């Protein structure tokens, strides 16, 4: 098995060299067993790397003023992932919202990455006993109203269908 997400185009995504082994194993599980697309697996990988960086700073493993982009996400073992608490998860969500300016949908997706990772660690790999994300709900997403055509725009669309195409009657219907 390749260490690249995209075997046909290995330059598209870098090999998994900058994350803990647990994260690498999880992303491979996503691709091979769960059948997720390479892009989905890669996005989860990036989300978990960012969480690793956040946790290193939160636990004092790097200087408090270290830039997130400069923190090495490697070096966190299974025992470390087992020490993460629900409060750590809440603090991460707050960080994403306040410091990173993530929208609710982005925060929800990053939380889904963590949910999936801990589900894998507890239920599939049997490496951990507790899931700190189990009782954490995603942020409530704003409802987006559908965009609709005005009566005039709908009429224009129908008129256009009568003058274009090989089957104007069908297109009009």
Question: Which residue ranges define each predicted feature?
Answer:
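Conserved catalytic core of the tyrosine transesterase superfamily
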Residues: 1-173
């Amino acid at each position: 098995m390749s260490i690249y997400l995209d075997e046909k185009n290995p330059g598209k995504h870098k090999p998994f060299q900058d994350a803990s082994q647990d994260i690498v194993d999880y992303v491979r599980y996503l691709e091979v067993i769960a059948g997720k697309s390479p892009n989905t697996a890669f996005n989860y990988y990036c989300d978990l790397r960012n969480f690793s960086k956040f946790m290193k700073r939160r636990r004092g493993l790097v200087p408090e003023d270290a830039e997130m982009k400069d923190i090495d996400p490697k070096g966190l073992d299974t025992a470390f992932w087992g020490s993460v608490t629900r409060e750590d998860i809440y603090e991460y969500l707050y960080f994403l919202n306040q410091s990173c300016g993530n929208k609710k949908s982005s925060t929800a997706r990053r939380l889904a990455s963590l949910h999936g990772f801990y589900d894998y660690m507890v239920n599939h790999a049997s490496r951990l006993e507790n899931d700190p994300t189990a009782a954490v709900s995603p942020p409530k997403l704003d409802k987006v109203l559908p965009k609709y055509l005005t009566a005039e725009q709908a009429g224009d669309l129908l008129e256009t269908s009568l003058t274009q195409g090989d089957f104007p009657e069908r297109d009009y219907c």
